[in-house]
């Protein structure tokens, strides 16, 4: 474990959070011992990629409107998927943390949740981040997100019903409250073994982290 902590310190010193999007939330963080909200403790704890038996798991708190989240998703994540997730070394867990300063981030999160209902979360995730121009226009993205849903192979009638009914509002609230309880204040934020990871968040950094943790537990 000593190697793990030394690596976190070293990476933090090198990176300084280059991919960190800080936006202060208006709520004070609860005491570390405060229990998570009841709604956050249900059976759903985020969408995952990778084997459940992977030796290392990373939890990402992300905002679909966040430009640094989009950069991470389109530049770093494809390498992480190929080199770490597909090879069974890493499991990735995605949690929503739409920031209140972003007008349509919660709507985007809802679109991804509704896609997840049809088993297409990661397809919608990629559509939202790969076509991130929507986040810079300031225009209501409702029709564009519906196009993303179509491109993701969704049943549009089911998608529309889910969006109109705000079916996963409570789930999003629970994810945000869980992030608040952990002290998340910006996106993307990463947690490894329940501890915040403060490195640059590059694919090389995560590879080094996985290698270190894997060696530690051999």
Provide a role label for each language-model segment.
Residues 23-38:
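Ser/Thr/Pro/Gly-rich low-complexity linker/stalk segments immediately outside membranes or between
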């Amino acid at each position: 474990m000593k190697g793990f902590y030394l690596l976190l310190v070293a990476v933090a010193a090198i990176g300084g959070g280059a991919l960190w999007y800080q936006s202060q939330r208006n709520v004070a963080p609860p005491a570390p011992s405060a229990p998570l909200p009841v709604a956050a403790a249900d059976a759903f704890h985020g969408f995952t990629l990778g084997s459940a038996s992977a030796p290392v798991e990373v939890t990402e708190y992300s905002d679909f409107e966040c430009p640094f989240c989009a950069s991470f998703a389109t530049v770093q994540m494809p390498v992480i998927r190929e080199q770490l997730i597909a090879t069974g070394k890493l499991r990735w867990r995605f949690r929503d943390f739409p920031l209140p300063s972003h007008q349509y981030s919660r709507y985007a999160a809802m679109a991804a949740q509704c896609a997840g209902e049809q088993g297409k979360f990661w397809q919608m995730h990629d559509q939202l981040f790969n076509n991130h121009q929507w986040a810079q226009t300031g225009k209501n993205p409702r029709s564009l997100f519906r196009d993303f849903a179509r491109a993701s192979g969704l049943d549009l009638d089911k998608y529309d019903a889910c969006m109109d009914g705000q079916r996963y509002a409570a789930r999003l609230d629970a994810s945000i409250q869980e992030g608040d309880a952990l002290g998340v204040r910006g996106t993307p934020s990463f947690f490894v073994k329940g501890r915040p990871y403060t490195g640059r968040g590059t694919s090389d950094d995560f590879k080094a982290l996985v290698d270190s943790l894997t060696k530690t537990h051999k």
